[in-house]
Amino acid sequence: MHEHAAGNPLLQPWDTPYGLPPFTAIRPEHFVPAFDVAIAEHRAEIDAIGADPAPPTFANTVAAFDRSGRRLADVGRLFGNLTSSETSPALQAVEMEMAPRLAGHDSWIFMHRGLFARISALFENRARLELDPEPRRVLERIHSDFVRAGARIVGADQARYAVVMERLAELTTQFGQNVLADESSYRLVLRDESELAGLPEFVRAAARQAGIERGIDGCVITLSRSHVVPFLTFSDRRDLRERAYRAWISRGEHEGPHDNRPIAREILALRREQA
């Protein structure tokens, strides 16, 4: 067992039913050490594939690449699900820290000379490999992914490409967190029956619960999709629908700490450079 695994459920076998993550034992502080270990393991696997002295084959190169990084994939999928469904300031801090690091790891893989040389050799000789259609398509897709991710870039341009990708990961993460902050902070309070007109019971129940959670006497519509979409669908009040809709389309588009407009400009500039 890895030295960092003690006390970290993300680095121990998941002996739960169906191999599901042990959600009750997982804390935000477990993720960065788990990512550290998983990235190191993945790099070792990629280095081993790239340095394999045997001639490249589909099995020892493409299939081996596909099998690599399983722990990183498991931790990453779990983290992504939590940040998209039950996030918190602590998880968002981890997300901001890890986004550029994970992007840098991806760039390192796609620009790994040894691995790409083996994939390229197989791709150039694919007509003579007598592969079935499915593995042949996998080979073609992986080769295309590497080329599009900068595998053929050399020298200073390669280093700059990696920097651009890391910055884009940081910016897009901040963009998403700003939108989420606006969604969670917005409150459309409905206090009388006329303001609830047209809303079915399931929408009313969700709005009542949102009010209770926020200590507000009344029903509350937030900008989470589970609130605002049913409200826009069923509400009889055109004026209230308009207020909610305008708030929805203005997320991250206003002065203040959650203003996404300068972030969007930088993202566009970097994507132009990336292209």
Predicted feature residues:
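Zn2+-dependent metallopeptidase catalytic domains
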Residues: M1-A275
